[in-house]
Amino acid sequence: ITRDHHALLWINPHTSFYFRSELQMVSDEGLDAYGAVTWGQFFVYQGFNRTAGWMHTSSGVDNIDEFLETVVKRAGRYYYRHGSELLPMQARTITVLSKTATGMARKTFTAYSTQHGPIVRKLGDKWVSVSLMRKPITALIQSYSRTKAGDYAAFRKIMELHSNASNNTLFADSKGNVAYLHSN
């Protein structure tokens, strides 16, 4: 709190000074925001514009779902049980390059996924798929759009996209509105 009893939103008190850069972003389309960005982001992740500020906290909220998949192999393909149906798993070949003492090595493997998300491990005889932020374009839209929100009503409308999957959000505007959005 300032000496005049105004709230402050601190950016990144938990990270080192060099973890995130802080900058101002201005455009002819109405963007004028200052704050912290992470490498490669084209939006202010947490910061403020002329009338509003936002920041994020992390917590142990339930923001990921895991599914135990019953997997069956038939005719060289994997299927998973969904209700009373067997649905085909999506399979994708991925090649990873790595440096070795004699040069570059390639390792190719198959990644599987269901409608719930990618398979990440095996638990007993079940395969485990995870569902977390499966809307990357919507997440980018939400992250960029909130930099232009001038008040709580506009910010809340943007947050209705529900694609900021791993953080809680704190918000304050020049009208005196203060909000906490839990794992949005």
Report each predicted region and the residues it spans:
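Mature extracytoplasmic enzyme cores
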Residues: 1-184
